[in-house]
Amino acid sequence: MDFLDFPALVVDESAALPQPASRLSLASLRLNDDEQEAKFVLPNVSKHDTEFTDLHSKMKHFASISLGEIRPASVSLSKEVAAPISNNIEKPTTTNQLLSKKINSLLNVPNYASYTSDSETKRALQILDANHSDLGLNFNQLVASDFVGTLNRKSLRSKLENSMLNSHSDILSNFQSIARRIKRLSGPLERINNAMQNFKDTTESIDFEFEHVKDRLDQLKARRQVIIKLRDSLTLTQLELDHLQNGTINDLFFQILNKINFIKEKATYLLSNEKTTSAGVALLKTMNNNLTVSNKRIYNYLINFIEEYDTLSRQYGERTIGDESLSNFQTSLIHLSNDVQFFQDFLNRIVGLRSKRLLDDFLSQFDIDNKKLQRPIILSAHDPVRYLGDVLAYVHSMIVNELEFLKSTFKLKSELVTSDSVLKDNMDFIGDLHLKLLNEIFTSLANTIRIRLEQIVRFENNPMLNLDIVQCLSLYQMMLVKNGINESSQLMTSLNDLENLARSKIVSSVTSYLKDLDKNQIAAADLLPPDWFVDYLSKLSQLLNKLEQQNETRILTDDLYDKLILDPINNNLVLNLQNWFPTAKKEKSARIDLLIVQINSFDLVKSKLGPFHSTIFSSDYGKSVFSKLETQYTLCVTKLKETMNSYLFESTGMELYFNLFNMIFPIISVQDELDYDMYLSAVENPIMKLAVIHDNIHEKLNTYLPLAVSDFQDVKLFNLMPPAVEEDIVSTCFGNFIKFYKVFKSVLNKIYPEDEEMIMSTLNFTTNEVSTLLGVEDK
């Protein structure tokens, strides 16, 4: 309210003239005697603009208003009054001019302490002017410059202050409840304020510049475009989805499937980021559902295709498939291979259809009453191998025909095998699908085929026929493998088992044949091998000859050598021959006969098995078996030599002396006459007396020596079959006798030099005469 006391508070300009106090009436100043100043009217400040660009404009405005309200005053002043004043005032001044100056100073003084700005003072005056009727103000009294004006202004100030205080009191009383609430909420508000302050502290670094926001907006727009592109590339259109579910299976259908597989591949990348995992899972789920629908349609299409083809083939024979249909079929097959369950069900269905048809065709070949067959397969007891071959030949023809069909249908065309196709992930599984199906189909037929063949193999006991069966089975196994049948398939396993069975039947049938032979034969007078052994060797040689011709080496096992060669000779033959000559250990003559029949038997073995030495007996074990046979043969010959040598010395009465000299030093090792001295110690033996020697040797020597050659060749060794062995035995025995006769006679001459006549009468043959009698040249 300080503006109401403006006359008392205004600071005059230092350069202006001194003015009377505001409590003095301006009328007391008789500056203008000619005309009394009219009543001053306060200008309506509300009608004037209050907005100025600067202080100078404001001053100019109010100065013009003041000058307009002041009339020109008379310059004629009374000399009495103007005289004292004219010294102090340079020009006359009116009351209106003073008031205008006061108001102008009030409104334009920037340093007035009671006001904060000119706008507030102007606003106060405008409010006072607008409400003067409500306040009942008398402006004439308020602006009066006398004491009454001062009192009115002070009274107005007091009224306004009381009114303001009452208004403020009412406002404060009304705000007490609000203050209480604010006080109650001050704690939470303070905490909120602190939290906001902390939040402001943390967000002080955030820069919300326009360029940054604009760049962010551009990024979001670009991201939106990318997302739209991704959405278009990772989703199916309504037309594509409808064609996938209801459309024809054609190139467009396969293009949609390729798109689905592409989407699935890209969706897996979304799973690598935690932010996009849920999107990737949802996308994969949707695409998998679409693939399930498409795989069901493809499965039904493939089944209908094969069933239709099979039906037409039964009615009109094997049909050919068009290129377009075959391409759609194989492309569908490629896409179905991604679903293991549907694909395996389809393959099982194919295997079932084809195997049933082939089984019917196979069984119909054995129907004699089937008039459609020109030549049914009939089992013949006279030619079981022919029946076996016919069955295998028909099986082979079925495999060849089925392979051609499967190859034309399931072997993928080269243009379908591309690097960017679905096949690249399934090539290992679907690449040789026609061969896999072929093996699966004939796996279903394997048991039926095995039953037809096993009845021949299991009940055939002829080793020759069994060998033919082995060859037939081995040949067809090789042919079937060449035409796509796996060696590990059930059909090949069955054929291999039958081959092994037939191979084992060869050994078992030969051993059964040997067991059935009559071995209760008496000793032959000619000391030839037993008849049963001759028959067995003949059978065995025929078998070995066939094995050699057919180059069948897998049957040449250790078991075959043992059961067919060693056991019959070592157990059956040797025991049988020993039973023929039970006194061979005691009687030298029986032992000679036993050795001769053994040599004859081994010579027969050698003649029968010798031709197979480099073929049948080429294996390590075969060589050892053949070596054992030769060793036994040589051992028998050696034993016969020793026995015949002993028989010769015994027949001439010189056996005791021969043994005595060999105990001292082997006769065979004597080189010259110097070695004779080693036998001089034999004189100490009683049998070395000349009289005893004469009694033991003279008569037997003269009796047997002339007959020795005929006795050896025509009696004892007459039945020995190998002439070389006979010649070797004769020459060895006679040579030993001549050498001993010479040494023995020379030693006696050294021991008894004075009894030369006695020695000559006992050993009355010279060395040359003995050599001549025995037919051996004296060396």
Curated annotation (Swiss-Prot):
InterPro entries: COG6, COG6_C, COG6_N. Keywords: Golgi apparatus, Membrane, Protein transport, Transport. The keyword Ubl conjugation does not apply. It is a peripheral membrane protein. GO terms for biological process: intra-Golgi vesicle-mediated transport; protein transport. It is found in: Golgi apparatus membrane. The keyword Transport applies. GO terms for cellular component: Golgi membrane; Golgi transport complex. Pfam families: COG6_C (PF20653), COG6_N (PF06419). PANTHER family: COMPONENT OF OLIGOMERIC GOLGI COMPLEX 6, CONSERVED OLIGOMERIC GOLGI COMPLEX SUBUNIT 6. Acts as a component of the peripheral membrane COG complex that is involved in intra-Golgi protein trafficking. COG is located at the cis-Golgi, and regulates tethering of retrograde intra-Golgi vesicles and possibly a number of other membrane trafficking events. Belongs to the COG6 family. This is Conserved oligomeric Golgi complex subunit 6. It comes from Kluyveromyces lactis (strain ATCC 8585 / CBS 2359 / DSM 70799 / NBRC 1267 / NRRL Y-1140 / WM37) (Yeast).
